[in-house]
Structures are given as C-alpha cells and as structure tokens.
Amino acid sequence: MAKNRRDRGTDLPGDGDQKISTGPEIVSVTVHPSPNLAAAAKPVQGDIWASLLESSPWSANQGGLVETAQPPSAPIRSQDPVPVADLVNRWSQPIWRTAPLAGNAESSEEGVVAPSLTQSDSVLAVSDLVIDVQPETDAEVEVSIEPEPALVEPVIEIEAEAAEVEPEPAPVADLVNRWAQPIWRTAPLAGNAESSEEGVVAPSLTQSDSVLAVSDLVIDVQPEANAEVEVSIEPEPALVEPVIEIEAEAAEVEPEPAPVEPVIEIEAEAAEVEPEPAPVEPVIEIEAEAAEVEPEPAPVEPAIEIEAIRVELEPVLIDEVVELVTEFEYSQAESVASADLIANPAPAESSRLAELLDEAAAIAAPAVAVAVEATRQPNKITASVKKRAPVQEVPVEDLLGGIFGVAGSAVRGVFTIGGGFVDGVVKGGRLVGSNVVAGTRRLAQTIEVSCGSCSSPKCDAEDKNK
C-alpha cells in the first residue's frame, strides 16, 4: 500500500537538499501573550438596574444604588502581542516538506489513478490550540504533539464507472489562510509527465492536500516576559492512499429508442363511389288488345232490349280512357324532375298529335256517347228507359255496323293515346303529356256533343242532347 504514494517533495522551491527525518523535531517558540487573555471583569447583575434607577426622574436619589465589590482588573502590559500566525509560520513549513516515496513512480507506470487528497486529510485547525497562561517567569515549556494514528483507507475497485468522491469542505480559519499560501506554491511533480504520456489521469494537488490541522496542537503558553516555548511536533505518518482500479471499458449506454412514426398505407385503388340511382321512368307497354280493366260496378247497369235482341253495353273502353287520363295527370307531377332535359317538341309533332286526336273523335260511334251517358248519369238513363214503353225498332245491320265502328275507333284511339304517351316518356316532355290529356278531353267532349257518323234515322234526339 505504501507504493501508491506519489513523490511530493522533490521539486519543492526552497528545499534544496534538505531531508527531514521521521523523528520528532523540537521547535523553540517565543509567545508574548496579549493583555486580552486576562479575565475581564463582568458587571454584577444589580449595577445595570441601579444605574437605570439613578437616571430615572421618578426614583429617589440614591434609592436603588447597590454598592458591589468589583474584582481588581489585571495589570495592562505595554508589550505588543505576538499573533499566533507568526508562531505557526515558523514551524509549519518544514513539516509539510516531506521526502518523496519510491512507490509513486511505480503506481503511475502501472496505469493506476491515484486519488486526489482533499482538504479534510491533513488540516491543522488553529481552533484546537489550548493555551495555558501561567504567571511564572523565565520558564521553558516543552510541548510534544503526538499525531493521530494513520487511517488505512480501503481499496475501492470500480468496474463500470469511476466513483465521484465529493470531499466534505472543512472550515479554514482566516489565520490559516495567511500562512498556508506559500505552502501550495509547489513545483509540478516529476511523475505527472510520465502519467500524462501513458494516458493515466494524474491526481491534482489541491490546497487541501497538505494542510496540517492546528486543532491537534496543544500549546502551553506562559504570559511572562521573554518566555521561551519549545514545541516538538511529530509529523503524522503517511496515509495509505486507496488504490482505485478503473476498467478501460466505459459503461454501455443504451440509446433511447427512436420514436417510430406510424406508417399509413394508402391503397392505390380509389374508393368505389356508388352512383345515385337514376330516376326510372315508367315504361308502359300497350298491347294491341285493350287492357282488361275491371271498372267499378255501376249502381244501375242499363239493359236495352231491341226487338228481342238484348244488347248489353259495357263501358270498358271509356273507363280505360278515364283511367289513362288520371294516370297522365298523376305522372305529370313525377315528370317535373326531368323538366331540364326535356326539349321543346317540334311544331310538326304537336300538330300531328292534334290531327290524330281529331280523327279519333270523328270516327267515334254514337254508342260511345250512350255508354258515357249511362256511366255518368245512371239515374237519368234508368228513368228515361222506364218512361219509354214502346220498343223502337232498329235494324240489325245498322246495329252491328255501329258496334264494330265504335270498337275500331276505340282501339285506334287507344293506340294513338298510347303512342303519344310513349313519345312523351321517351322524350321526357311535360308538354307532350299535357297535350295528350288535352286531346283526350277534347275527344270526350266531341263524343258528348255529337254522335259522329251515325246512320240510324230512328235515334232518340232527347237522349243524345242529354
């Protein structure tokens, strides 16, 4: 353990070839005590109150004065006191200039980092001086100071990281600062150059490395004039410095994981947008044969008997026409949404439709008017039938011809109306539908007004007018 010490006295300034032995050294110290060391007279407790009562205007003269016997004060000496700093400066410097140890060079070559000495290792505190003042004359006092036993510090092995030892700051008196400064002005050690070349950290010598605690000194001082004090100071044994082994490998620091940014995968295919369903226009298929529409039962179905031939007129075709008209009026509201796409029909087409409607009205048979009147005014027809007692004679040929003519005109009228409706649906024209409705109404009006091409001379004029 002694090999870990570093040479600390080879290049100190002012040493020369001086070698200090390890044995005790006796130093003669002359101390001139200051007059302040004498015990000062303390005031008696009653004096303060007595003085206050004396100065008070409300107290009687000499009422609270208490005479106390004060101890005689120590004689004041004319000699100037010698500060303790001068005393310490005379014997402190040769103590710290110790001989270098041979083991420091070997420890620096082996790559071991020597610990740095702190102020708390060898601080001599002046506050621990115990000075006994005795009134004897011409006395020689020998003071022997025994150092504390050496502290063996443990060997610290640090594998991952070097331990950071924070020294505890020791209070340094102002008196020590006055004489401690020339001690620290030492020359650099010879072992530092070798350790720096080999990559070994050399210990730094701070002010606290070689401060001798004055608190360990016990000095008996006699206040007599020309007193000679002999102080023998034995230096403390060398402290065994700890060997700190630091591995070359530094602790592996795990880096913090980098924040992983979320990766958003965007598919190349665009989202399939479902188109809105287009408004489906109703398509009405008109067959060649008339659609069978079940009409609402009329309250009274007229039965006309002509010469033992019973002819029952069924208002099927007229009801179909009426229902188509209502369907056209209902679909008129649905065709408003497609009004922007409707082109105005050509005048030739509208005139053609009007001509077809006029032809259908002219071809209509008088039996259609009878059927319409029977469906619209059943009560009147039944009343008129009841009034006619004699049965009119109608030729069978005229009757059959009229029936077939009415049926053919009705079929043609249905075809024309269906064709106009289909044209209106295909073209999406609202005007075409209105023209169809108007033509149907005109057809009904013409049937009601005139019987058309009826060749029967024995027709009841009153019924026709009705």
Swiss-Prot record:
First and last residues of every Tandem repeat unit repeat: 81-168, 169-256
**Would you say which domain of life the source belongs to?**
Bacteria
Which biological process annotations from GO are given for this protein?
magnetosome assembly
Q: Name one GO cellular component term.
A: magnetosome
Instruction: Tell me where it resides.
Output: Magnetosome
Q: Where is this region: Not required to restore magnetic response to deletion mutant?
A: 1-24, 81-256, 136-334, 333-374, 432-466
Tell me what PTMs the record reports for this protein.
Identified by N-terminal sequencing of a protein that is about 96 kDa in size. The protein runs anomalously on protein gels.
What induces its synthesis? Part of the probable 17 gene mamAB operon.
The region called Disordered is annotated at 1-23, 60-80
Where are Glu-Pro-rich motif repeat segments found?
145-164, 233-252, 253-272
Outline the segment boundaries, as ranges, of region: Required to restore magnetic response to deletion mutant.
25-80, 375-432, 426-466
State the phenotype upon gene disruption: Single gene deletion has compact clusters of magnetosomes instead of magnetosome chains; precursor magnetosome vesicles and vesicles containing immature crystals are throughout the cytoplasm and no longer associated with filaments. Cells have substantially decreased magnetic orientation. No change in location of MamK. Single deletion slows recovery of MamK dynamics following photobleaching. Deletion of 3 consecutive genes (mamJ, mamK, mamL) leads to cells devoid of magnetosomes or a magnetic response.
**UniProt keyword annotations, A-Z:** Biomineralization, Magnetosome, Repeat
Protein role:
Required for assembly of magnetosome chains. Regulates the dynamic behavior of MamK filaments. May connect magnetosomes to MamK filaments. Moves from the cell poles towards midcell; movement does not depend on the treadmilling ability of MamK, suggesting MamJ associates and disassociates continuously from the MamK filament.
Give the record's family classification: Belongs to the magnetosome MamJ protein family.
Free-text note on domains in this protein's UniProt record: The gene is quite polymorphic, the central region is subject to recombination between internal Glu-Pro-rich repeats. The polymorphic central region is not required for function, small segments in the N- and C-terminus are however required.
- Other comment: The gene is quite polymorphic, the central region is subject to recombination between similar Glu- and Pro-rich repeats.
Question: Subunit details for this protein?
Answer: Forms homooligomers. Interacts with MamK.
Q: What is this protein called?
A: Magnetosome-associated protein MamJ
- Which gene is transcribed and translated to give this protein? mamJ
